[in-house]
Regions:
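FMN-binding flavodoxin-like domain, especially the glycine-rich phosphate-binding loop
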Residues: 1-66
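Short secondary-structure transition/capping segments
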Residues: 13-16, 22-30, 48-58, 89-100, 114, 142-143, 146-155
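Conserved short-loop catalytic and cofactor-binding motifs
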Residues: 23, 80-81, 110, 141-142
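Conserved active-site and cofactor/substrate-binding residues in soluble primary-metabolism enzymes
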Residues: 30-33, 84, 113
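A mid-sequence, solvent-exposed acidic-amphipathic segment
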Residues: 54-87, 91-94
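Iron-sulfur cluster-binding cysteine motifs and their immediate structural context
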Residues: 79, 88-107, 113, 117-134
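Long, positively charged, glycine-interspersed low-complexity recognition regions
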Residues: 125-155
Length: 155
């Protein structure tokens, strides 16, 4: 009988740019403090109902159709001439959705999970979703590295 809402940085850059680093740091600190309070409330078996903000509720309504459209969403992905063919995009994709052929061309297999790890972890920012993301900064959690992403996949 409890629910809470914790604001974290948004990394879905087709919709909006991630917050600036100082704002991200504040979000992480606020989240850490709130998580401690949540843990205390859970330990004390306190009931708590905290609703989402309006934008969160609206996103919830769109979530079902969005999830259904994800596998083929990679059709809009592009790779610029900045690509060095390093293969990081392949290694961080949890769905094994990207092939990098010997001649250097990327192929998406239309089983995308929408995490955008390929886009965010590309060191050259060469992967984009159409023109929408070309000028938007990338986001990586400050404590997450390529090696962490590979480890989660079991690579």
């Amino acid at each position: 009988n409890a629910s809470w809402w914790i604001q974290m940085p948004d990394n879905y850059i087709p919709l909006s740019a991630p917050p600036a680093v100082p704002e991200q740091k504040k979000m992480f600190e606020d989240a850490k403090n709130k998580a401690a309070a949540i843990a205390q409330a859970v330990n004390n078996r306190q009931e708590h109902k905290e609703g989402m903000c309006l934008s969160g509720r609206l996103m919830g309504l769109a979530y079902g159709p969005f999830i259904k459209s994800l596998p083929a969403s990679d059709k809009k992905f592009t790779v610029s001439a900045n690509c060095t063919k390093c293969g990081i995009c392949v290694s961080v994709c949890p769905a094994d959705n990207i092939l990098l052929h010997e001649h250097g061309k990327h192929e998406w297999l239309h089983q995308c999970e929408g995490c955008l790890a390929c886009l965010h972890y590309c060191p050259e920012e060469a992967i984009n979703i159409g023109k929408k993301t070309e000028l938007r900064p990338r986001y990586r959690h400050p404590k997450s590295a390529v090696s962490d992403m590979k480890q989660q996949k079991g690579d």
